[in-house]
Amino acid sequence: MQTLDKHKTVTVSQLADNLHVSESTIRRDLIALDRMGKLCKVHGGATINNSNSYLTLEEDVLTKQDLHNREKTLIAKYAAALIGPEDFVYLDAGTTTYHMLDYLGHTAASVTYVTNGIQHAARLAAMGCKVYLPGGRLKANTQAVIGTEAIRSISNYNFTKGFFGANGISTTAGFSTPDFSESNVKTEALHHCQKRFILADSSKFKKVFPVTFASIQEADIITDMLPDDKYSKLTNVYEAGERK
């Protein structure tokens, strides 16, 4: 990606020579990166992807659990380390925030949590943590509590830190998600957090979904690797992965 960022276009043979791998390996990698929206595969090579991908469909939680696990683990571990004793934390429903529960450590018992994630609440309770679950309607495919009752409950809280997922991140559309009701809950919770963090792997960048729940400037981003430096000019970005 660094070669492509520098030259804007690159051939399969150039990449094979530079990376000392076969052209068939390069072609497979380019196909995968094209599907992730990180570049545009063309005949004989690839070009940089400067445009946003506009998407509407949302995968269910079981499908998401199997995607980008390495990246989610890096992000979750970094995010969990930001939680300190006596924090009052909001955890948004989502697979990356769920990964955080593996790394809460010895401070978990002294922290109070509010989450709209059913799986999150059950796991935190099993760990002996103090956890509150807002009322509302259960969205089956994401296991998230949504609706006006959830928003009303969350509006009473003042969180020290909040950790949120996002389906898409764009410099123009901000942080976005496919569902209006889920977006409203995210927005309400985010506005009641002193510190706000969006947890998103690098595949989420340059993607736009129907509903924006916050602008780029409203939250810091924790990702595995930043695909474009322009985001760091708009907000704080923390990279949990290693640059290659």
Where on the chain are the PLM-derived regions?
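Conserved phosphate- and dinucleotide-binding cores of soluble alpha/beta proteins
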Residues: 2, 9-15, 20-22, 41, ...
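HTH-adjacent hinge/linker in prokaryotic transcriptional regulators
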Residues: 2-13, 18, 24, 28-90, ...
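Short, glycine-rich nucleotide/cofactor-binding loops
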Residues: 68, 91, 172-176
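Gly/Ser/Thr-rich loops at beta-strand to alpha-helix junctions
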Residues: 95-98
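A residue-level structural signature of the nucleotidyltransferase/glycosyltransferase Rossmann-like core
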Residues: 112-113, 161
